Amino acid sequence: DVCDSLVGGRCIHNGCWCERSAPHGNCCNTSGCTARWWCPGTKFD
């Protein structure tokens, strides 16, 4: 299973690390981590 990216050694399948409390609400869209809302679809292995 190919990882889009790694954060803290964890595989992220949608390519972004999304956190509700992140300073910029960083989340995933087709351009990368630029969407300004929470995306609950982030999946870690």
Swiss-Prot record:
Domain of life according to the entry: Eukaryota
Gene Ontology cellular component terms for the protein in this record: extracellular region
Keywords: Bromination, Disulfide bond, Hydroxylation, Ion channel impairing toxin, Neurotoxin, Secreted, Toxin
Tissue specificity: Expressed by the venom duct.
Single GO MF annotation: ion channel regulator activity
Disulphide bridges, residue numbers: C3-C16, C11-C28, C18-C33, C27-C39
Subcellular location: Secreted
4-hydroxyproline: residues carrying this PTM: P23, P40
Transmembrane segment boundaries: none
Residues modified to 6'-bromotryptophan: W17, W37, W38
Function statement: Mu-conotoxins block voltage-gated sodium channels. This toxin reversibly blocks voltage-gated sodium channel in cephalopods, with no alteration in the voltage dependence of sodium conductance or on the kinetics of inactivation.
Free-text domain note: The cysteine framework is XII (C-C-C-C-CC-C-C).
Protein name: Mu-conotoxin-like Cal 12.1.2d
Organism: Californiconus californicus
